[in-house]
């Protein structure tokens, strides 16, 4: 397995990660024992990075990972994602970021991520969707940086839209994401 640093100042993680969408049941019925076996196999082969999200089985994926990691001693980094408030997906460039990611909602959502993953601090939290138009009004990222300073998040980022992955470059330059 090859390893690299996660983000600009992050810890070393495996270049191959475990994508946990399927273990949440979003792709159909999934036996929890099969999910645990898949996680065990990945970690046994050197994987140290797991990607999940609030929306993967309505938090089921996170809960499985949180319970599973209690039985392992490896240093594993978990990246999870918080969705915006209900509305058009992906968000329209004309919608207000403050309505889709208000501070109260972000804080409540982060508390649920912490509970599901059975941890006191999230390794990586991504906003689960983004639009380039929000680059000029990054209030949600500023809120996440404040929550990071409080110790509830170690690294902040965004899940970029497939059609506009370069929208993140400006945010990286401005230090709003890790």
Short names for language-model regions:
Residues 1-77:
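N-terminal binding-site loop/beta-alpha segment at the start of enzyme catalytic domains
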Residues 12-14, 22, 26, 88-95, ...:
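Glycine-rich, positively charged active-site loop/lid region within alpha/beta enzyme cores that binds
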Residues 14-15, 73-76, 80, 120-124, ...:
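Short acidic capping loops at alpha-helix termini that bridge into adjacent secondary structure
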Residues 21-23, 53-55, 81-85, 127-130, ...:
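Active-site beta-loop-alpha junctions enriched in small/polar residues
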Residues 69, 82, 144-147:
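Hydrophobic positions in alpha-helices of CheY-like receiver
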Residues 71-101:
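Structural motif corresponding to the early beta-alpha repeats
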Residues 89-178:
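Glycine/proline-rich, positively charged
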């Amino acid at each position: 397995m090859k390893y690299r640093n996660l983000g600009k100042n992050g810890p070393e993680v495996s270049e191959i990660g475990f994508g946990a969408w399927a273990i949440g049941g979003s792709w159909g019925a999934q036996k929890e024992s099969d999910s645990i076996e898949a996680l065990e196999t990945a970690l046994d082969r050197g994987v140290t990075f797991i990607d999940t999200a609030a929306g993967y089985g309505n938090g089921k994926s996170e809960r499985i990972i949180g319970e599973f990691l209690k039985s392992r001693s490896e240093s594993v980094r978990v990246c999870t994602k918080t969705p915006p408030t209900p509305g058009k997906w992906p968000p329209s460039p004309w919608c207000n970021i403050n309505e889709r990611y208000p501070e109260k909602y972000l804080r409540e959502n982060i508390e649920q991520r912490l509970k599901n993953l059975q941890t006191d601090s999230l390794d990586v939290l991504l906003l689960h969707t983004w639009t380039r138009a929000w680059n000029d009004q990054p209030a949600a990222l500023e809120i996440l940086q404040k929550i990071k300073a409080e110790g509830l998040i170690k690294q902040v980022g965004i899940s970029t839209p497939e059609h506009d992955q370069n929208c993140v470059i400006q945010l990286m330059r401005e230090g709003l994401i890790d």
